[in-house]
A protein has these predicted regions:
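A short helix-loop
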Residues: 1-32
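Internal alpha/beta core interface subdomains
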Residues: 3-8, 57-61, 77
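Beta-strand segments within the central parallel beta-sheet cores of soluble alpha/beta enzyme folds
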Residues: 12-19, 75-78, 102
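Glycine-rich phosphate-binding/hydrolytic loop that grips phosphoryl groups
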Residues: 1-4, 103-123
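Glycine-rich phosphate-binding loops at beta-strand->alpha-helix junctions
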Residues: 67-95, 107-110
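Short helix-capping/linker segments at secondary-structure and domain boundaries
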Residues: 6-11, 46, 67-71, 119-123
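Adenine-nucleotide phosphate-binding core of ATP-dependent small-molecule kinases
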Residues: 34-67
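A short glycine/serine-rich beta->alpha loop
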Residues: 46, 99-106
Length: 123
């Protein structure tokens, strides 16, 4: 949704955000309202890289609030498709103050865990 609003591909979103020079805040947690903010920033002629970075900061901020609920313990692993986005990964690593462990093909880790759990239950 956000990549489409910025008229770039989803694969470009992460690398583009790493070129950011201006700190932009996206305050909405709702994706529809956040998209409205993005469209407004585009109308203000803000740089695509800066907007993308703002989007990634909002995503990372939400992840950080969830992490704080369960407790921050060093040695973080990131799974899921978002782990393939270098922009989100960079912001999270900055906020955590350490490197994230990301395995090859992070988007299948949840399914792999579910399969192993299911296998354990039937054996």
């Amino acid at each position: 949704m956000m990549a489409r609003s910025l008229e770039i591909s989803i694969d470009e979103l992460g690398p583009v955000s790493l070129q950011s020079k201006e700190n932009i805040e996206i305050s909405s947690m709702c994706s529809v309202f956040a998209e409205s903010e993005v469209i407004s920033l585009i109308a203000q002629n803000k740089e695509i890289a800066d907007i993308a970075h703002g989007i990634h900061k909002a995503i990372a901020g939400k992840a950080m609030s969830l992490l704080k609920r369960v407790g921050l313990n060093p040695g973080y692993m990131m799974t899921g498709g978002v782990a393939k986005n270098p922009g989100v990964v960079a912001v999270l690593e900055e906020q955590l103050g350490e490197k994230l462990h990301i395995y090859e093909e992070p988007e299948i880790i949840g399914a792999l865990g579910a399969a192993l759990y299911g296998l354990e239950k039937i054996l």
